[in-house]
């Protein structure tokens, strides 16, 4: 069966389902790299992608946002030494799906809501508070606009609304 749309898993209710030792067959998260670029560099600004609503972000949406932000920054800034990109959320929550068939004669093959717990199909990061940090980018002053655009493009890959917050890292940048 194909992957359901992200809107199916955006909202959550109940406790997180995270105990991997009790859950057989959890697929690995698509996102594997969380820190990219030169994290030890000397930067002027930090741009943060912050949530404005509660919700869940599936692992493939986190990976899509990371990939597009990294691709844009690498292209615009010519080198991965000119920025640091860090994804701060990890998809711990296991998502289940009770597969339903929608074709003629499917009622003979499936059980409906009997035994409807579902099988694990992926993982998601839960954002339970407003203003949680999803990812951040650190850049020098001359690359500020490119970093803003990269986070704007990355936010379009996420299922919940976000905003970009800019803060100066050193006193000279704060004075300007």
UniProtKB/Swiss-Prot annotation:
**PROSITE patterns on file:** RIBOSOMAL_L10E
One of the Pfam families matching this protein, by short name: Ribosomal_L16
Q: Which GO terms describe its molecular function?
A: structural constituent of ribosome
Q: Which family does it belong to?
A: Belongs to the universal ribosomal protein uL16 family.
Transcription regulation as a keyword of this entry, yes or no, is no
Gene encoding the protein: rpl10e
Q: What is this protein called?
A: Large ribosomal subunit protein uL16
Q: Coiled-coil segments, which residues?
A: none
The record's InterPro entries line, in alphabetical order, gives: Ribosomal_uL16, Ribosomal_uL16_arc, Ribosomal_uL16_CS_euk_arc, Ribosomal_uL16_dom, Ribosomal_uL16_euk_arch, Ribosomal_uL16_sf
- Kindly state one GO CC term assigned in the UniProt record: ribonucleoprotein complex
In terms of domain of life, where is this protein from? Archaea
Give the record's keywords alphabetically: Ribonucleoprotein, Ribosomal protein
Keyword Ribosomal protein attributed: yes
Task: List, in alphabetical order, the GO biological process terms annotated in this UniProt record.
Answer: translation
């Amino acid at each position: 069966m194909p992957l359901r749309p992200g809107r199916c898993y955006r909202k959550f209710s109940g406790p997180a389902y995270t105990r991997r030792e009790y859950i057989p067959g959890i697929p690995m998260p698509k996102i594997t790299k969380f820190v990219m670029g030169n994290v030890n560099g000397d930067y002027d600004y930090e741009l943060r992608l912050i949530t404005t609503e509660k919700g869940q972000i599936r692992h493939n949406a986190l990976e899509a946002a990371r990939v597009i932000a990294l691709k844009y920054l690498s292209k615009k800034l010519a080198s991965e030494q000119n920025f640091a990109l860090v994804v701060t959320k990890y998809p711990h929550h296991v998502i289940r799906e009770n597969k339903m068939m929608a074709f003629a004669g499917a009622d003979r093959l499936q059980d409906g809501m009997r035994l409807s717990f579902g099988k694990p199909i992926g993982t998601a990061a839960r954002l339970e508070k407003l203003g949680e940090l999803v990812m951040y980018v650190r850049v020098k002053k001359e690359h500020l606009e490119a970093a803003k655009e990269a986070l704007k493009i990355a936010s379009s890959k996420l299922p919940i609304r976000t905003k970009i917050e800019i803060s100066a890292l050193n006193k000279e940048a704060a004075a300007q």
